[in-house]
């Protein structure tokens, strides 16, 4: 799980993909923050080689407050449906750096989760490490 902002580390992404591959785990790359224009476009371009290698790369906006164009809304909705279908009936690990929207999407999938969220630090271009524990959620998808 990565986002257009804060900028993701390709090294961290590659390590996660290698670990998943070594364990026979299907990896899906989710790029969040579709509403961030040029930042999103740059991040999407950086993910093109992963798409060429056969990884599923989905574009979404996890924030219900995001200002999306009608086209972006369609893309986000289609990606969410594709992601939910891929996760249905499976144990899933949502992995990614701080500030990428993992807790935001979990709160939407599990309304009772109450996972705390914050804005990212503009000064540091990173998340504020809001989620400090690992939690197992049951999702009826």
Identify the residue ranges that each predicted region occupies.
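Conserved Switch II/interswitch segment of TRAFAC-class P-loop GTPases
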Residues: 1-13, 25-28, 34-40
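Alpha-helical scaffolding segments of alpha/beta enzyme cores, especially the outer helices
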Residues: 15-18, 45
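Anion (oxyanion) recognition and catalysis
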Residues: 17, 21, 51
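Short glycine-/polar-rich loops that comprise or flank the Walker A/P-loop
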Residues: 23-27, 53-56, 89, 141
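Canonical P-loop GTPase G-domain recognition
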Residues: 36-100
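Conserved RecA-like P-loop NTPase ATPase core
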Residues: 87, 105, 137
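Walker A/P-loop
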Residues: 98, 103-104, 108
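Switch I (effector-binding) loop of TRAFAC-class P-loop GTPase G-domains
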Residues: 111-141
């Amino acid at each position: 799980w990565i986002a257009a902002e804060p900028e993701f580390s390709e090294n961290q992404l590659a390590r996660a993909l290698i670990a998943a591959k070594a364990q026979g785990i299907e990896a899906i790359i989710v790029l969040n923050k579709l509403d961030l224009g040029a930042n999103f476009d740059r991040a999407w371009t950086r993910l093109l080689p992963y798409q060429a290698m056969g990884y599923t790369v989905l574009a979404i906006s996890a924030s219900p407050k995001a200002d999306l164009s009608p086209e972006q809304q369609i893309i986000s909705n289609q990606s969410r449906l594709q992601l939910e279908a891929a996760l249905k009936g499976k144990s899933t690990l949502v992995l990614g750096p701080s500030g990428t929207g993992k807790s935001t999407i979990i709160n939407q999938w599990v309304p009772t989760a109450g996972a705390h969220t914050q804005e990212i630090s503009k000064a540091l271009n990173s998340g504020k490490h809001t989620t400090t524990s690992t939690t197992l959620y049951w999702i009826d998808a």
